[in-house]
């Protein structure tokens, strides 16, 4: 299963980035790190995102908190732009994803360090894609994780 997983950025904070990975089961096909915001995502989609082959798009679900005025809720604007490009996307909460997909697993699968960024947003996208597969019992992804770990151990 090919999963396009996206960790959306702020639409206002210029140092924020959107992390994107394309996974083939548990293997990395490609990754991208985009400058902040909706417009930069739309630009990437026009040049790259619209021609990608995938089975599902998974985007981190952002929980708006009305009572926390220090929090940047503009991520929802970036998600809205992503949804215009990929109307059938799945919004996935990330609660528990660091426990279910630990750092050591990402490292073992080669999904820890990425050339194009400081890694955090791309790593979060990779974790989100695997978390979605695990939580939804996507057998081919889970089997591939097991096979890759077994091969590394032998």
Regions found by a protein language model. Give the residues of each.
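Phosphate- and other anionic-substrate recognition elements at nucleic-acid/protein interfaces
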Residues: 1-154
């Amino acid at each position: 299963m090919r999963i396009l997983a996206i960790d959306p950025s702020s639409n206002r904070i210029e140092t924020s980035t959107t992390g994107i990975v394309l996974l083939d089961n548990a293997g990395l096909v490609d990754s991208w790190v985009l400058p902040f915001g909706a417009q930069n995502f739309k630009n990437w989609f026009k040049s790259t995102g619209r021609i990608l082959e995938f089975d599902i798009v998974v985007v981190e679900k952002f929980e708006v908190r009305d009572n926390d005025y220090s929090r940047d809720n503009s991520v929802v604007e970036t998600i809205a732009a992503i949804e215009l490009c990929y109307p059938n996307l799945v919004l996935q909460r990330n609660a528990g994803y660091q426990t279910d997909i630990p750092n050591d697993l990402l490292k073992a699968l080669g999904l820890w360090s990425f050339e194009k960024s400081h890694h955090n947003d791309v790593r979060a996208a990779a974790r989100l894609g695997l978390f979605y597969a695990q939580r939804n019992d996507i057998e081919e992804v889970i089997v591939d994780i097991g096979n890759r770990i077994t091969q590394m151990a032998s």
